[in-house]
């Protein structure tokens, strides 16, 4: 029998196919631009996004929305799978600057998950049980999480960390999306994550639900 995960994947594929069909019918108007940026943009790599933008008529490519999206896609390419990570240095709960580089270069860490989230983001908090399960299982085997919060309220940020038992590394500028890391990693929305290996290379992106546990399990078994 079909599992829930398989069913969900089938529905997601069907939805993406339908979205692409509607997108192809609306490349000459702003509805098509909205579909690409808000529906498909989150799933595509930087290069795939540039390829989609190139299919729009020249006059549509001059619109503010597509110009912004193209700039974002060009930045995304810098953090695609296979690219080196971009360093981040932000304050932890004690106000001490903690750099992503120091975590990645720590010999004890074979893989580091750079996780962008916020306490007000429902889907982010929905991922917490999966993050906890993976962290608890693999933290002593070389897996670490570097969480970057896009909260604007320090109390909300640290309260969520404590109440949900998120026992990994946390940093935040407490400025919402007005965060240098959001620009460097071309974050379109959250939750968003990047898996970095011990050499500092991005090896996976946006691992959700059980996919994170399965990926770490597979990598650490090698």
Annotate each predicted stretch with a short phrase.
Residues 1-103, 108-109:
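Oxidative protein folding and maturation machinery
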Residues 136-179, 183, 187-190:
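Conserved segment of the thioredoxin-like fold in thiol-based oxidoreductases
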Residues 108-112, 191:
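Alpha/beta-hydrolase fold active-site loops
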Residues 116-133:
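Conserved redox-active cysteine motifs that mediate thiol-disulfide chemistry
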Residues 166, 173-221:
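Thiol/disulfide oxidoreductase modules built on the thioredoxin-like
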Residues 50-53, 132, 154, 158, ...:
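Extracytoplasmic/secreted envelope proteins and their assembly/folding machinery
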Residues 113-117, 147:
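Structural cue for short, hydrophobic secondary-structure segments
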């Amino acid at each position: 029998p079909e599992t829930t995960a398989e069913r969900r994947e089938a529905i997601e594929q069907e939805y993406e196919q339908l979205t692409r069909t509607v997108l192809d019918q609306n490349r000459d108007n702003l509805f098509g631009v909205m579909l690409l940026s808000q529906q498909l943009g989150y799933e595509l790599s930087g290069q795939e996004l540039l390829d989609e933008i190139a299919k729009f008529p020249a006059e549509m490519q001059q619109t503010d929305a597509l110009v912004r999206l193209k700039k974002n896609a060009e930045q995304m390419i810098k953090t695609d799978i296979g690219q080196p990570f971009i360093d981040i240095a932000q304050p932890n709960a004690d106000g001490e600057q903690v750099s992503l580089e120091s975590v990645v270069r720590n010999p004890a860490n074979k893989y580091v998950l750079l996780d962008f989230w916020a306490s007000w983001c429902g889907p982010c908090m929905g991922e917490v049980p999966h993050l906890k399960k993976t962290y608890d299982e693999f933290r002593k085997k070389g897996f670490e999480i570097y969480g970057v919060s896009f909260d604007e309220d320090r109390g909300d940020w640290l309260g969520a960390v404590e109440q949900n038992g998120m026992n990994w590394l946390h940093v935040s500028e407490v400025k919402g999306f007005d965060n240098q890391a959001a620009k460097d990693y071309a974050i379109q929305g959250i939750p968003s994550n990047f898996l970095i290996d011990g050499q500092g290379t991005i090896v996976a992106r946006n691992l959700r639900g059980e996919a994170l546990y399965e990926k770490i399990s597979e990598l650490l078994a090698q």
